Amino acid sequence: MKTLWQHCNVASMASGVYSIIEDAAMVTSGAHIEWIGRRSEAPAGDYAQVNDLAGAWVTPGFIDCHTHTVFGGNRSGEFEQRLQGVSYAEIAAAGGGIASTVRATRAATEEELFGSARKRLLSLLRDGVTSVEIKSGYGLDLASERKILRVIRRLGEELPVSVRSTCLAAHALPPEYAERSDAYIEHICSDMLPALAAEGLVDAVDAFCEYLAFSPEQVERVFIAAQQLGLPVKLHAEQLSSLHGSSLAARYHALSADHLEFMTEEDAIAMAASGTVAVLLPGAFYFLRETQQPPMEALRKHGVKIAVASDLNPGTSPALSLRLMLNMACTCFRMTPEEALAGVTLHAAQALGMEKTHGSLEVGKVADFVAWQIDRPADLAYWLGGDLEKRVVRHGVEVTV
């Protein structure tokens, strides 16, 4: 079924820049874009439907390429404690921090996890998100990681959003493996990843490379196991210290390395050579009141593609708005609105290995787009919060969230 969408301006984000088409039109056939260009040049045809977009600015559907949407419990109490002067170490010693989320997630049923994650994901969708990545990592044993990954798959089946599932079993050390991190890494590589991959629950594998998590040597073992299973890898790296995890990620041609506040220029050079995307997470930077910014000039200088994501998680970025992250990327990291928009479209698609089908409005790509009632594309990063008037189209069909 062919549909004509017209009376709009388009920021197609082809090549990662606005690539503006004024007074534009677009033809979709089924779930894909068949033609896009100036309205005066639109092909004549017997369209099943003609949609007037009322002068809207059309962008690709937003892609949130780094989230931890599925978890049990609530850590707003810790937020209060930290603001009253209790340190993160004291909270963790009392059983809080990530350990409390692991306990709550393990205790929750699959149905309970689905219900709470669905609400959070709907908030992202109301912001124009049409594709999302969701990580496991709050189970830290085979049964609980499987439970989370099954919920992630179900979210993609029941909501109007394309979902990529990432296994982050190497997120933290579970209590039953205290002081035995090498043994836990061996369990991930020999038992967890093969079983979960065999069940078709995993699209990519991630790990947390940090002094309070896992060493580069341990992460490399996870990467080798993932590659033996034919799975692409990603990495949380350089958030709190420099371990050159991003260079390790580049060596294994990772889809992305994420956070990166403490990365070096040498890391940026390695990522550029491997095509590894830098995923910046301004929500966590803001929420933790960090002061060390990612090396933006090094990333730009060496041509590293830069994505932006919500990092939605209960401990360090309880962010329910990807559009708010656009503003934070601009204000905290001095990105331009154009760079930030590329960060949640084409470069986010690249961070998920989806750039051939998603992330820009080009012939042959999937027809995921948002028609925004705004004056110019920069408005998407300019307005703080609120619900901008919009129409969301996924796979060529208008959806209501």
Curated annotation (Swiss-Prot):
Keyword Metal-binding assigned: yes
Similarity comment: Belongs to the metallo-dependent hydrolases superfamily. HutI family.
Residues annotated to bind N-formimidoyl-L-glutamate: Y138, N313, G315
Listed pathway(s): Amino-acid degradation; L-histidine degradation into L-glutamate; N-formimidoyl-L-glutamate from L-histidine: step 3/3
HAMAP family, per database record: HutI
Entry GO MF terms: imidazolonepropionase activity; iron ion binding; zinc ion binding
Annotated binding of Fe(3+), by residue: H66, H68, H236, D311
Keywords assigned by UniProt, alphabetized: Cytoplasm, Histidine metabolism, Hydrolase, Iron, Metal-binding, Zinc
Cellular localization per UniProt: Cytoplasm
Origin superkingdom: Bacteria
Pfam families: Amidohydro_1
Cofactor(s) of this protein: Zn(2+); Fe(3+)
Protein name (Swiss-Prot/TrEMBL): Imidazolonepropionase
Binding site for Zn(2+): H66, H68, H236, D311
